[in-house]
Amino acid sequence: MNYWDTACVLKLYTAEPDSATYLTLAGQAAEPLLASEILATELTYALYQKELRGALKTGSVERVLKQFQADCDAGRWLLLPLGRDVAIRAAQVATACYQRRPPIAVRTLDGVHLATALLAKATHLVTTDERMRQAARALGMTLTP
């Protein structure tokens, strides 16, 4: 199963230059797409930021969020809970990344996503974030694309 980072999920719901690649990848999935339940919150913030920058038509946020919720309700997404196990694993991710030489400056929410993906035993991580990709490689994860 593919675990999806928020930036790549955004490409599924808003037009970006490389959206077609991610729509194809999501469309090929035989099982639900994996993400942390924090995705819904991050997606909301990201959509409003796009709207403020003029990259999303004013008033579109609610429509996009309704579509995302409909996809969740239809079983397209499996949103994994943020529990103590994720917090513990995220701290381990931080230790593994920051103690490397050179260190990988993974951000907090990226660490939460990496921890969630590891706990879910996701087969691939879908992300475009270079720091997150470096951390994932260091943790032995397979990247897509």
Which positions does each model-derived feature cover?
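Short alpha-helix immediately C-terminal to the canonical SAM-binding loop
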Residues: 133
